[in-house]
Amino acid sequence: MAKQGSKEKKGYPELKEVIKATCKIRVGPGKETLTEGNCLWALKTIDFIFEDLKTEPWTITKMYTVWDRLKGLTPEETSKREFASLQATLACIMCSQMGMKPETVQAAKGIISMKEGLQENKEAKGEKVEQLYPNLEKHREVYPIVNLQAGGRSWKAVESVVFQQLQTVAMQHGLVSEDFERQLAYYATTWTSKDILEVLAMMPGNRAQKELIQGKLNEEAERWVRQNPPGPNVLTVDQIMGVGQTNQQASQANMDQARQICRQWVITALRSVRHMSHRPGNPMLVKQKNTESYEDFIARLLEAIDAEPVTDPIKTYLKVTLSYTNASTDCQKQMDRTLGTRVQQATVEEKMQACRDVGSEGFKMQLLAQALRPQGKAGHKGVNQKCYNCGKPGHLARQCRQGIICHHCGKRGHMQKDCRQKKQQGNNRRGPRVVPSAPPML
C-alpha cells in the first residue's frame, strides 16, 4: 500500500508524452524551448489553485474547464506576469494533448483562441442558426462563413480538425508544396481574409520561406495600389487583408470580392516561392560543403540571394538567416560560441569574423585540446595542489618547468640516479653535497 501511495500523481505520468511534445514548442521564433520544469510548474500551480479538480485525470475536458476558470480570475499587479506565463504554458499543453504541433507559444495561444471562438459561437448562436438553417450540421465543421436561410451570414472559427489536417500536410509535404496549396485553396473558399492569413502564419515551415511569402504578398498589395487608384467603390489593401474588421463584418456579402482577392494573393505567393525553391541557384539550397571555407560559402550564398527578384529587406533577411542555418556544423558551433544568443541577428560580417579560422590546423588543434581537456573533479584537483620543486601552485613537481636539482652534484636538470658524476670514483671528483631542504617560499 505504501508503494502505491508514493506513486500517486507523482510527475503526472499520464501526461508524459504530452509534456515531451510540449518541450518542443519555442518561447518565440529562434528562442529556447519550453522545459519539463515549466510544464510541471504550470500543472502544480493549477492543482494548487483549483483543489476541487486536483483528483481528476488530466483530460482535454479538464483542461478546458481550467482554461475557462483562469479567464475569470483577476491576478494582482505583482502576479500578472506569472499569470500570463501560466495561461501560455497551459495553452501549449492543451495543443499537445490534442495532437497539434505549434512552433511557438504565440501560435499555441492562437490555436486555443480559435477553438475558444468556435465554442463561444456555438453556445451563443447554435440554437438560432439551427432553427433558421436546418441542414447546417453537415457543413458547420468546415466552413467559417455560413449562409443563413433567413438571409445574412454567420461566422464561426476554423475547426481544429481542418487546421490539424493542414498542419499535417505542411509538415509532410512542405508549406509551399502543391498538396498544401490545393488543401488551402479548397478550405479557404469560405474563409475570411483574417482566417486565411492567421492559419498561414501558424503553419509549420521554413522561416525564410515564410518571409518570402510575406514579401510576395507585399508585392501584390503594391501592385493593387498602383493599378487601382483610391475611389468610392475601390477596395483598399486593408479591406482585402481584413485589417480593422471584425470577423462578422468580414463574413458579409460585400466583402466577398476582398476575400477572394486575398485568397488569390496567397495562392500566387505560395506558387512563386515554390518555383523559386525548385529553380537552380535557389539560395535556400546553397549550403556549405564539408571542405569549403566559410568565406567561399558566403560568396556563393550572397551571389544567389542577389540574383533573386525580391525586395532589399527580404534579401537582407535571407542573408542574415541562411548565413547561419545553411552553414556547416563546425561553423554553426563556432558562431554559437563567439556570438552567443545574438547569433541569429548578427550581420554576415560578424559571422565571417567568427568563422575565419574554422578548418585551419590551429582550429583543429583547439578542438582536439578541448576534447582531451580533463573535466569534472579531475580537472579541478590540480588547482589547489602545490609544486614541491618551485613552490608555485597549479602543478606537481614532476610537471615543473624549472627542472629538478640533483642531490649528488647540486646541478639542475637531472635526478641523482641519473647523475654522470656519481659513476666517477674518488671523493675529489665529487661536488659539494647538497642537503635537501624545503623549497623557498615564492
Swiss-Prot record:
Q: Which GO terms describe its biological process?
A: viral budding via host ESCRT complex; viral translational frameshifting
Q: Where is this motif: PTAP/PSAP motif?
A: 436-439
Q: Where are the zinc fingers (CCHC-type)?
A: 385-402, 404-421
Residues with site note (Cleavage): 363-364
Tell me a GO cellular component: viral capsid
Task: List cystine links.
Answer: none
Tell me the domain comment: Late-budding domains (L domains) are short sequence motifs essential for viral particle budding. They recruit proteins of the host ESCRT machinery (Endosomal Sorting Complex Required for Transport) or ESCRT-associated proteins. Nucleocapsid protein p14 contains one L domain: a PTAP/PSAP motif, which interacts with the UEV domain of TSG101.
This chain's protein is named Gag polyprotein
Upper lineage is: Viruses, Riboviria, Pararnavirae, Artverviricota, Revtraviricetes
Q: Which gene encodes it?
A: gag
